[in-house]
């Protein structure tokens, strides 16, 4: 059983110290696509966190029984099964958001974060700590999506979760929405800015000069 210090490191380390998007540059594609509004960013964050945590748990539980030659196939089968469950739950209880997320929930199957944690951590670690690792990396992914989604919705649409914060000119207010932020590629610049900010407050993450 892992000690409390190790569990805290596994659970909270991926948020800033070892963020899967900002430091490892994994899972960037979905981060670009689903952050136009905070609501879709939150749902995608929850979906990926659940899949990563439970895939880590199940893979770790059977890791000693998986032949090395087929381990990737087994991992993808478990991950795909969990993604199907999550996708069906979204369609049942939040159909409109499911339509907005489109194929990106299904593409969690190929997300580098999920596959990477299964191979690098769950295959070598006990179930409970693997479960925490999945949650931790999900939180790190969620942190980036929530920050980007909040900025884009607030300054692009003047709202947060659909509630008006900055009254738009077309509605009789004073704020002119930034149309550039509504476009998916603007997430590149925002993620770049977030990476710069994190490496400013944590200079140990800056790559040494060659």
UniProtKB/Swiss-Prot annotation:
The chain crosses the membrane at residues 10-30, 42-62, 72-92, 103-123, 143-163, 178-198. Keywords: Cell inner membrane, Cell membrane, Ion transport, Membrane, NAD, Sodium, Sodium transport, Translocase, Transmembrane, Transmembrane helix, Transport, Ubiquinone. GO terms for biological process: sodium ion transport. GO terms for molecular function: oxidoreductase activity, acting on NAD(P)H, quinone or similar compound as acceptor. It is found in: Cell inner membrane. GO terms for cellular component: plasma membrane. It is an enzyme of class 7 (translocase). It catalyses: a ubiquinone + n Na(+)(in) + NADH + H(+) = a ubiquinol + n Na(+)(out) + NAD(+). The keyword Transmembrane applies. It is a multi-pass membrane protein. Its EC number is 7.2.1.1. It comes from the Bacteria. The keyword Ribosomal protein does not apply. Its main location: membrane. Composed of six subunits; NqrA, NqrB, NqrC, NqrD, NqrE and NqrF. NQR complex catalyzes the reduction of ubiquinone-1 to ubiquinol by two successive reactions, coupled with the transport of Na(+) ions from the cytoplasm to the periplasm. NqrA to NqrE are probably involved in the second step, the conversion of ubisemiquinone to ubiquinol. Belongs to the NqrDE/RnfAE family. This is Na(+)-translocating NADH-quinone reductase subunit D. It comes from Pseudoalteromonas atlantica (strain T6c / ATCC BAA-1087).
């Amino acid at each position: 059983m892992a000690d409390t210090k190790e569990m805290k490191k596994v659970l909270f380390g991926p948020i800033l110290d070892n963020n899967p998007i900002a430091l490892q540059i994994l899972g960037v594609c979905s981060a670009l696509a689903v952050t136009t509004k905070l609501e879709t960013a939150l749902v995608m964050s929850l979906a990926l966190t659940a899949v990563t945590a439970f895939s880590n748990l199940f893979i770790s539980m059977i890791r000693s029984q998986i032949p090395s030659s087929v381990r990737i196939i087994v991992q993808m089968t478990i991950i795909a099964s969990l993604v199907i469950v999550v996708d069906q739950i979204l369609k049942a209880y939040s159909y409109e958001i499911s339509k907005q997320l489109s194929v990106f929930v299904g593409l969690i199957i190929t997300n580098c974060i999920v596959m990477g944690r299964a191979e690098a951590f769950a295959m070598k670690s006990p179930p409970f700590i693997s479960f925490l690792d999945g949650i931790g990396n999900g939180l790190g992914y969620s942190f980036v999506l929530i920050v980007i989604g909040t900025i884009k919705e607030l300054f692009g649409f003047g709202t947060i979760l659909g509630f008006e914060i900055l009254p738009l000119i077309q509605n009789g207010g004073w704020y002119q929405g930034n149309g550039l932020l509504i476009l998916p590629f603007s997430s590149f610049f925002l993620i770049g800015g977030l990476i710069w900010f994190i490496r400013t407050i944590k200079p140990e993450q800056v790559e040494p000069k060659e």
